[in-house]
Structures are given as C-alpha cells and as structure tokens.
C-alpha cells in the first residue's frame, strides 16, 4: 500500500492583495478610527510576520497577539508598531515587556499586583491595557457579574506602582450574529463598556487607548465610538462578509489517483 506524507496533503495559499483589499475596506468602514490588526496564532495559520507587514504598510496603528513569543517574533522581524498581548504574561517576563516596548493585557487584580511587583523590582514601568469582561465569559474584570466591584478593581490597578495603564478593551461575544437576542446582547456589552470607561475617566484615569470592536463589531456598528477596532482581515472562502471581504486564502489539495 502506497502512503502519502501527511504534511504534504494540503496547504493554504495567501493572497496578500486580497488581504490589503479587506484591510482597506474595514478601514474605510471605521472612518477616522485607527485599527489594531490581530495576528495571533501565526495570524490564524496564515503567517504572522507576512500579514503584519501588510497591515503595517496599510496603516495599522497596533498589532495584537496571544502571547509574548508571538510579540517577540514580530519585533525580531523589524515591526515597530505598538503590540498588545491579549493573553497571559508571566511576571518574570516583565523585563522583556519593558525592553521591547510590548503592552500586556491586565485582567485581574492579583495578576496586576504580580506585574507591578515585577516592574518595581527592575525599576521600570510596564504598559498594560485593562481587559473588561462585559459578557464574553473569558478573562477580564467581570463588569456583567458585579459592575461596582469590577470597576473598583480596575481603579486599584490604575494606582499600582510600576504599571502604566494606557488602555481599556473588551470583546463582543456575538457581534457576528444577527438575531434580535444577539443584537440586544451586543448592545448590553457596549453599554457596560462605556459605563466602565466613564467611571475610569471620572476618577482621573481616562485610558488613552480604548477598543471594544472586533471585525464584526466595526462592520455592523461603525457608529459606535470604539477608539481602536481590532480586526483580522484574512477573509477565508468559508467566512467572509459580502460587505467588504475578498477571500484571501485558497486551500490546495494533492490527491492520489483513484
């Protein structure tokens, strides 16, 4: 029986011109708002460095990744845009964050205190964006569960030494769904986020960078002031919006005869 090597069965081809088209379409929809290009997980398997360079050339203001290794890969490739790590960063890696000017997500008070202690130990400041959980149910200060406690926690983070709180963000759970319940849920998330932003601002800690929209959010609700929409503009053959997206990937198979 003749066997085929698994690694050669299929691959993805990326059309960088289509990627540019999609980014420009989202940028046009966002109006004057700058965009954060999400290139986590190797840009969803499509080449983080290659995609990030396209986004940078097209005017992205930020890049977002899932972990420190991904952020460092972009820095080593010569990308100088601000980078946000959406996931966890070990406190012991704070010196790298400071040295390479990488921003960490801050999603809980204990985590913030650990980052603060690590930064103070090396005599520096680490930049962080507060992560609000308005209904996604992942990491973040749980505004939907107990708004007052969550806001109090965020305010305490803002007062910690060694931290420079430069942003506030959240993630819409069902912005890509068109049912009445989903639209209502997305609106509730947006309202909670705006309340949190206002609470921080009124206490004297207005974040410089505010971002709550994902790709679906900015396409469906461009009228909502989101500050820095986060978008990933691959547009695969199976998942793309007729409003803007051109498929940027093509699957290729080599099949044995018969």
Regions found by a protein language model. Give the residues of each.
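Extended substrate/RNA-proximal surfaces in nucleic-acid metabolism proteins
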Residues: 104-105, 224
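Active-site loop/helix belt of alpha/beta enzymes
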Residues: 7, 41-49, 53-54, 58, ...
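Conserved catalytic phosphorylation-site environment of P-type ATPases
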Residues: 112
């Amino acid at each position: 029986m003749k066997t085929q090597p698994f690694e050669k069965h299929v691959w993805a081809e990326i059309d960088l011109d289509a990627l540019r088209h999609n980014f420009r379409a989202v940028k046009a929809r966002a109006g004057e708002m700058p965009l954060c290009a999400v290139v986590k997980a190797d840009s969803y398997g499509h080449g983080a460095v290659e995609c990030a360079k396209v986004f940078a050339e097209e005017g992205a203001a930020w890049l977002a990744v899932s972990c420190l290794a991904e952020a460092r890969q972009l820095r080593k490739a010569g990308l100088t845009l601000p980078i946000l790590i959406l996931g966890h960063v070990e406190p012991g890696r704070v010196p790298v964050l400071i040295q390479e000017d990488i921003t960490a997500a801050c999603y809980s008070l204990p985590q913030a205190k650990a980052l603060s202690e690590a930064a103070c130990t090396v005599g520096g400041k680490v930049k962080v964006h507060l992560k609000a959980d308005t209904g996604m149910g992942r990491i973040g200060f749980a505004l939907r569960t107990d708004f007052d406690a969550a806001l109090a926690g965020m305010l305490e983070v803002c007062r910690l030494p060694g931290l420079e709180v430069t942003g506030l963000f959240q993630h819409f759970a069902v912005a890509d769904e068109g049912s009445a319940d989903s639209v209502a849920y997305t609106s509730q998330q947006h309202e909670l986020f705006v309340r949190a932003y206002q609470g921080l601002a009124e206490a004297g800690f207005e974040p410089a960078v505010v971002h709550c929209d994902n790709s679906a959010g900015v396409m469906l609700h461009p009228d909502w002031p989101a500050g820095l929409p986060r978008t990933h503009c691959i547009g695969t053959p199976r998942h793309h919006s007729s409003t803007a997206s051109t498929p940027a990937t093509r699957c290729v198979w080599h099949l044995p005869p018969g």
